[in-house]
A protein has these predicted regions:
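Cap/lid segment of the alpha/beta-hydrolase catalytic domain
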Residues: 53-55, 89, 97-167
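Bacterial N-terminal signal peptides
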Residues: 5-16
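Primarily recognizes the serine-hydrolase "nucleophile elbow" in alpha/beta-hydrolase
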Residues: 102, 171-193
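Surface-exposed patches in mature extracellular/periplasmic domains of secreted proteins
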Residues: 38, 162-174
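Mature extracellular/periplasmic domains of secretome proteins
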Residues: 82, 109-113, 186-189
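Structural recognition of the beta-strand scaffold that forms the well-ordered cores
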Residues: 64, 92-95, 118-123, 171-176
Length: 193
């Protein structure tokens, strides 16, 4: 991990090519029960997506990391983490989901990123929209949705932040409404540290 952090330091201070290589190098980062499926240096530009679609939002240059966390055999927690290419404020913000979750609002990561945060979101451990048929016969997925996906996303994201940016966030925040409010309370009550 030290060599990756050294490469990151060179990448941030020397040239965009090094930053791109450091970002892409995250795909080889060893994580506990998680895999980084994609790590891409993204130039400044418009992003769209998420549940509501909506007008494009301009996001600053960043390293977009996607991954899957599997703490149990039946778990499949998708997450996305955006790390600013420059101007990191030293803080982490995780976004909550609404309703039954089931997707990642990647475009929602643009706003905290513009303010210098490393920002992450998760699908809460399942892919799908309204309804909870995904939980039938899958008690581990229900636990993932209940609290584990949010916590695991936070842990894995902070490990990736340390690897790429060379230090842990000084503060962590959670932003959400609807189910995101419940997620924030579960995280604060179960893991107050």
């Amino acid at each position: 991990m030290r060599s990756l952090a050294g490469l990151v330091f060179l990448g941030v201070s020397a040239a965009p090519l090094f930053a791109q290589q450091a970002c892409q190098g995250l795909t080889s980062l060893a994580l506990e029960h998680a895999t980084i499926t994609s790590a891409t240096a993204v130039p400044e530009g418009p992003v769209t997506g998420g549940r509501g679609g909506g007008a494009p939002v301009v996001a600053p240059a960043h390293c977009a990391v996607q991954g899957i966390i599997r703490p149990t055999k039946d778990s499949e927690i998708h997450f996305e983490l955006w790390l600013p290419s420059s101007g990191w404020n030293g803080k982490y913000m995780q976004l909550g989901s609404g309703g039954w979750a089931g997707s990642i609002n990647a475009a929602g990561l643009a706003e905290p990123l513009k303010r210098g945060y490393a920002a992450a979101a998760t699908d809460d451990g399942h892919q799908g929209g309204a309804g909870a048929t995904w939980a039938i016969g899958h008690p581990e997925k229900l636990i993932d949705f209940g609290y584990r996906a949010v916590h695991e996303t936070s842990l894995q994201s902070k490990t990736i932040i340390r690897a790429l940016l060379g230090r842990s966030p000084s503060r962590s925040y959670f932003n959400g409404c609807s189910d995101g409010g419940r997620e924030a309370l579960m995280e604060a009550q179960r893991y107050p540290e």
